[in-house]
Amino acid sequence: MFPKYTSGIVHIGELPLGGKFPIRIQSMTNTDTNDIEATIAQSIRLVNAGCEMVRITAQGITEANNLALIKKGLRQKGVTVPLIADIHFNPHAAEIAAGIVEKVRINPGNYTDKRLSSGNLSNKAYDEELERIVERLHPLLTICKNNGTAIRIGTNHGSLSSRIMDRYGDTPEGMVESALEFGRICINEGFSNVVFSMKSSNVRVMVQSTRLLVQKMMAEGMNFPVHLGVTEAGDGDDGIIKSAAGIGTLLEEGIGDTIRVSLTGAPEIEIPVALAITERYNTERSSNHVIAGSEHLKSGYQAKRETIAVSGIGGNYPVSVIIEKAGEICIVDEHFNTTGILPQHNLSQLQVAEGNAVEMRSRLARYDLYDTKPIILKNSYLTDNLLHFQVASAIDFGSLLIDGIGDAIWPVSKKINAETVAQTSFAILQATRARITRTEFISCPSCGRTLFDIEKTLQEVKSATQHLKGLKIAVMGCIVNGPGEMADADYGYVGAGKGSVTLYKGKDIAFKNIPENEAIDVLINLLKQSGDWKEAAEK
């Protein structure tokens, strides 16, 4: 059994985080940090929506110093919410911010100098680099101790240091070790006001790395709180479902003390989604809620089970979506066309796990998961609120699909129309990589570093490429963080400056500093040159 993780308590200003305290909700402004009044105004809107911590980008010295003016303005208006500085590449900015705000977020992959290596680092060279990290981190820790400032050590899947990449590769193990190295330094320096996070736009990687982080922390006697989020989740329904599947899977396992839902657009739209996700956990958090399940489920099993085929379910068939239409149990495709009818008598040849995530896992724990009967995951939903339906079903089904469990999903709702239920189901399969039926778009929520209208640009990129099933295309606001956080993408559209864009193929730059008004045409030409373009079918 995966043991229950109980985090310690840290304080973000006056706000306690961890232990049995409620799961805290946070977001990040997307205003220019140099625009003091706009940042203050947006922070207030976030707080009024239910945000408990506000993060602000501080990419340079000027922005870090501006945090003092923003904090002063908020306090004068009676807003006492803790502020978090988001730092990349600039330790000096972090040190300035640590004397002003309640928490500083650093990325171990780019906080210290990224010395390029030729591979196969010797143990001596590896240890020497660690010593340099200690030297670089010491001033920040001293300032944080003197000011009661917390630190989030936030690893990103796509921005691991070359030293970590040499030894561990681009893996969850590398992500975890990158964070734990910094955590051990904090402990050795007598600093414990620490929060960890593992971020990826790939829900499976995010879940796997966070589970591994918790296991490693427990093995080393650490109990730091954990921040959860699917980075660059995208926009609209897809972003909501992707975030809920990743965050909810871990909350179901008792992991997670604060969350941020990253949606492209105004950050205020993130808060209702975050509230919908945390609602059922905050009512149970004061109890010893722990998910029921077998060791097989809890160990993070992700390979798809081998099963026989029954009426188009299981075997070599893709994970199916079952919908009740006109009194019949139908298998439908992503266009809501019926591709098969499931006779009632065939249900006896299937294993049906019914209920919410807790009930389904409890039932599955009694099954022989090495039996070759296909498993249908089924649950009924009484809500007529689309957001609540999307969040609940993404958690219930997603938390099992991520672990390779489920040959079909069968959401039942009498208050949400059947076509919307089917669309939500396919979005859950896409989010968990259980079945790919369309283009996947990875996009950042934008921040003060973004110099173009990312919502408009994302819609333009979608319009041009949404027919390219199976491709992953990223739209990122800035060159500072974009390339690292779109590691899972096949192609990337990244803001490079005012009016200019850099295009990526995988992790490599394909075209630099393209005028923004030409970028989509150049992206299409890049797709054609790479053999990934096809014309959209006529409707």
Question: What is the predicted function of each stretch?
Answer:
Residues E102-R136, R163-E173, A510-K512:
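Glycine-rich tight-turn/loop motif centered on a GG-T
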Residues M1-S27, L141, K145-N147, T283-G327, ...:
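N-terminal amphipathic alpha-helix/helix-capping segment at the start of soluble metabolic enzymes
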Residues K124-I133, M165-I308, H345-L468, K472-V475:
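Catalytic alpha/beta core domains of metabolic enzymes, predominantly
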Residues K20-A38, P82-N90, R163-V176, T231-I241, ...:
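Active-site mouth loops of central-metabolism enzymes
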Residues I25, D86, I153, F196, ...:
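Conserved, mostly hydrophobic/aromatic
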Residues E63-A85, R132-G148, L213-M222, V461:
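Alpha-helix-loop-beta-strand connector modules within alpha/beta enzyme cores
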Residues N30, A49-L74, P108-E128, V194-V203, ...:
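Glycine-rich, proline-tolerant flexible connector loops at the mouths of alpha/beta enzymes
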